[in-house]
Amino acid sequence: MKDPRDIIKRPIITENTMNLIGQKKYTFEVDVKANKTEVKDAVEKIFGVKVEKVNIMNYKGKFKRVGRYSGYTNRRKKAIVTLTPDSKEIELFEV
């Protein structure tokens, strides 16, 4: 099994994801090859919380051109992790 820190790349902080935190839903950018079970285990191990469910979205790379060179940006995978009602919250901004 991979190291949990290799699976969870970073939290995604936007206005929409900050509104979801009130519902105990946290959004992370994860490794492209990770599946729902690996994401669940990684979040539980890193943050010490209980995960109820995981929703995953795949994003393909966008086509970009710079002068005569063209190519695609990197693929991404985003995971929305829902915690159980009795689980503690994840501290994204430590004081």
Curated annotation (Swiss-Prot):
Superkingdom of source: Bacteria
One Pfam family recorded for the sequence: Ribosomal_L23
Sample GO molecular function, one term: structural constituent of ribosome
Single GO BP term: translation
A single GO cellular-component term on record: ribonucleoprotein complex
UniProt KW keywords: Ribonucleoprotein, Ribosomal protein, RNA-binding, rRNA-binding
Keyword Ribosomal protein listed: yes
Function: One of the early assembly proteins it binds 23S rRNA. One of the proteins that surrounds the polypeptide exit tunnel on the outside of the ribosome. Forms the main docking site for trigger factor binding to the ribosome.
Subunit structure: Contacts protein L29, and trigger factor when it is bound to the ribosome. Part of the 50S ribosomal subunit.
Protein family according to the UniProt entry: Belongs to the universal ribosomal protein uL23 family.
Protein name, per record: Large ribosomal subunit protein uL23
Source organism of the structure: Geobacillus stearothermophilus
